């Protein structure tokens, strides 16, 4: 096992990365190794998808499957080894069918890629795990060095984050064949074990630029189906009655669940990254969408154990449900998996609803505590002139984008302290689950404009980017000249690709924490600092002083 893709990874003087029987996330060595094997199979599939396009062959089943299966290897998504093997077998079957289509056009069709003809050696997990050793990401570390390995992983993990957003968009009927072509090209190239530093750096920026397009179509899918989010108050306390909790990012799953629970007497609560759903008109119209429950994903083993109903996980993040003994009432959807947990293959939630009706639910309603969400792209753009007016009248000094992933490290209290230290004449724009560090606190307003503005999920960084570009255009300056600072927390691969997206668009002087990714060496961090001004957090006092004086 070698996995260094998330912030929890083991860090020692001898090197970084989980490499024993089980990773810090709870992923076993077997599952981790089989995910390496799946990635190799997907690289071979992408190599043939690139070749097929040379013959004008575009297979949508291949294009949609590839990023979806890649998504299953993201942190805290799928811990179920048999399903990982199933994805690998499906990748190989799709590859062989695509290869046959190419050979039907050109009998001499060939692909020069070490993954292009990969076959699984056995049905036995142990044999497959031994085969996977050929594809361990650090297998040639001694030959290439830590810097090249780090850049490869930056690209691989960044592309994995983009693949997740591609799948989220596809669920909503949004895709782009040019994006698929670019994805396959990059994925296939990474399967050749590239070792050119400049080429890898260029690839990381290409991934960022591609992801901006992915976020654009995802935004179109969400707003096209469910309307533009508008500011909405959400209750974060319990309401009496039977209940279901839904977590993750998949708004379509939430919509289907709301439709199927309407009139049943079962209330629905959002959790984690599903919180922004309350801002969408076509979702909040369901009166039994009663509120948001819990906090950051890392607290789920306590909070889910206390929730008196079933839980549905639609995407990341799931962690071991046996710890809180709720594994008999947590359900997985789509690419999510945990051994022994019931999985929903389709859009029918009747079994979940039946379980909710058999459970006690909340016995009484707590005193409501309301927070505000729903500052989506259109709402932010509508506020652009107001922001400019406040700046011109010196009522608004600075905007801090304070967002990203949450996690368990104690150092993450930095983000709570930073938020509460932001001066009263400054605004906090937040997104992703890092907001749970401070989103239930009171921040007041500036002439009626809330000082805490919740822009949505991690992918809604797109909205923040569009706002920044719009403000810069209206003020006749560059984005980096705005009174705007980005202080981002990271945990996994979606955060990595958001960072690459921002860097690829030329955004500079981003501050990140609580730690640097374990796969980035001091040399690579120095390059990113020199090229983009990217740096790690220090103390709240020092960072606040520096950012306000920039």
UniProtKB/Swiss-Prot annotation:
The PTM Cysteine persulfide maps to 405
What is one GO biological process annotated to this record? response to hydrogen peroxide
Q: Which UniProt keywords apply?
A: 2Fe-2S, Cytoplasm, Iron, Iron-sulfur, Metal-binding, Oxidoreductase
Q: Which InterPro entries does this one have? A: HCP/CODH (IPR004137), Hydroxylam_reduct (IPR010048), Prismane-like_a/b-sand (IPR016099), Prismane-like_sf (IPR011254), Prismane_a-bundle (IPR016100)
| Residues bound to [2Fe-2S] cluster | 3, 6, 18, 25
* Gene3D superfamilies assigned: 1.20.1270.20, 3.40.50.2030
The catalytic activity of this protein is classed by the Enzyme Commission as 1.7.99.1
Manner of cofactor binding, per the entry note:
Binds 1 [2Fe-2S] cluster.
Where is it located?
Cytoplasm
Which EC main class describes this enzyme?
Answer: oxidoreductase
Cofactor(s) needed: [2Fe-2S] cluster; hybrid [4Fe-2O-2S] cluster
Query: According to its UniProt record, what is one Pfam family this protein matches?
Result: Prismane
The UniProt annotation places hybrid [4Fe-2O-2S] cluster binding at: 249, 273, 317, 405, 433, 458, 492, 494
**Alphabetized GO MF terms:** 2 iron, 2 sulfur cluster binding; hydroxylamine reductase activity; metal ion binding; peroxidase activity
GO CC annotations on file = cytoplasm
Source taxon at top rank: Bacteria
| The keyword Iron appears for this protein | yes
Q: Say which family it is in.
A: Belongs to the HCP family.
Q: What does this protein do?
A: Catalyzes the reduction of hydroxylamine to form NH(3) and H(2)O.
For this entry, the protein name equals: Hydroxylamine reductase
- Organism name: Escherichia fergusonii (strain ATCC 35469 / DSM 13698 / CCUG 18766 / IAM 14443 / JCM 21226 / LMG 7866 / NBRC 102419 / NCTC 12128 / CDC 0568-73)
Its lineage opens with: Bacteria, Pseudomonadati, Pseudomonadota, Gammaproteobacteria, Enterobacterales
- Name the encoding gene, please: hcp
């Amino acid at each position: 096992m070698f996995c260094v893709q998330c912030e929890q990874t083991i860090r020692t003087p001898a090197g970084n990365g989980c490499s024993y029987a089980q990773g810090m996330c709870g992923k076993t060595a077997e599952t981790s190794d089989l995910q390496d094997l799946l990635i190799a199979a997907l690289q071979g599939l992408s190599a043939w998808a690139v070749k097929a396009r040379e013959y004008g062959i575009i297979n949508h089943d291949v294009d949609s499957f590839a990023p979806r299966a890649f998504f299953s290897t993201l942190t805290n998504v799928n811990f179920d080894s048999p399903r990982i093997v199933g994805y690998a077998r499906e990748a190989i079957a799709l590859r062989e069918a695509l290869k046959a289509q190419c050979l039907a056009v050109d009998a001499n069709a060939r692909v020069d890629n070490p993954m292009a003809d990969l076959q699984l050696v056995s049905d036995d997990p142990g044999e497959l795990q031994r085969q996977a050793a050929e594809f361990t990401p650090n297998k040639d570390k001694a030959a290439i060095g830590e810097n090249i390995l780090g850049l490869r992983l930056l690209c691989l993990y960044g592309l994995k984050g983009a693949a997740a957003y591609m799948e989220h968009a596809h669920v909503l009927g949004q895709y782009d064949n040019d994006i698929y072509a670019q994805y396959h090209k990059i994925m296939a190239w990474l399967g050749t074990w590239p070792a050119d530093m400049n080429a890898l750096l260029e690839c990381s920026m290409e991934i960022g630029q591609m992801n901006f397009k992915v976020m654009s179509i995802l935004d179109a899918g969400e707003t096209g189906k469910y309307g533009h989010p508008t500011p909405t108050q959400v209750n974060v306390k319990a309401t009496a009655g039977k209940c279901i909790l839904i977590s993750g990012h998949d708004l379509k799953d939430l919509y289907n669940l709301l439709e199927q629970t309407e009139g049943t007497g079962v209330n629905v609560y959002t959790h984690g990254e599903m919180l922004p759903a309350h801002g969408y008109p076509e979702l909040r119209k369901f009166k039994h969408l009663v509120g948001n429950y819990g906090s950051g994903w890392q607290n789920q083993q306590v909070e889910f154990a206390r929730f008196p109903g079933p839980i549905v996980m639609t995407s990341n993040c799931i962690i071991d449900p046996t710890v809180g003994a709720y594994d008999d009432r947590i359900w997985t959807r789509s690419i999510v998996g945990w051994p022994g947990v019931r999985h929903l293959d389709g859009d029918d939630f009747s079994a979940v609803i039946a379980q909710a009706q058999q459970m006690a639910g909340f016995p009484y309603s707590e005193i409501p505590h309301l927070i505000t969400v729903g500052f989506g792209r259109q709402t932010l753009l509508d506020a652009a002139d107001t922001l400019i007016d406040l700046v011109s009248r010196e009522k608004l000094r600075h905007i801090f984008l304070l967002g990203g992933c949450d996690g368990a490290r104690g150092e993450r209290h930095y983000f709570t302290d930073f938020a509460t230290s932001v001066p009263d004449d400054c605004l906090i724009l937040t997104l992703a689950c890092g907001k749970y560090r401070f989103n239930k606190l009171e921040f007041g307003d500036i002439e009626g404009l809330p000082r805490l503005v919740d822009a949505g999920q991690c992918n809604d960084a797109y909205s923040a980017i569009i706002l920044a570009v719009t403000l810069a255009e209206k003020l006749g300056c560059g984005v980096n000249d705005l009174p705007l600072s980005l202080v981002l927390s990271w945990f996994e691969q979606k955060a990595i690709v958001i960072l690459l997206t921002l860097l690829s668009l030329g955004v500079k002087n981003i501050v990140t924490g609580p730690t640097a990714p374990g796969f980035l060496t001091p040399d690579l961090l120095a390059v990113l600092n020199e090229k983009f001004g990217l740096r790690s957090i220090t103390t709240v006092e020092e960072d606040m002083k520096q950012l306000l004086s920039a």
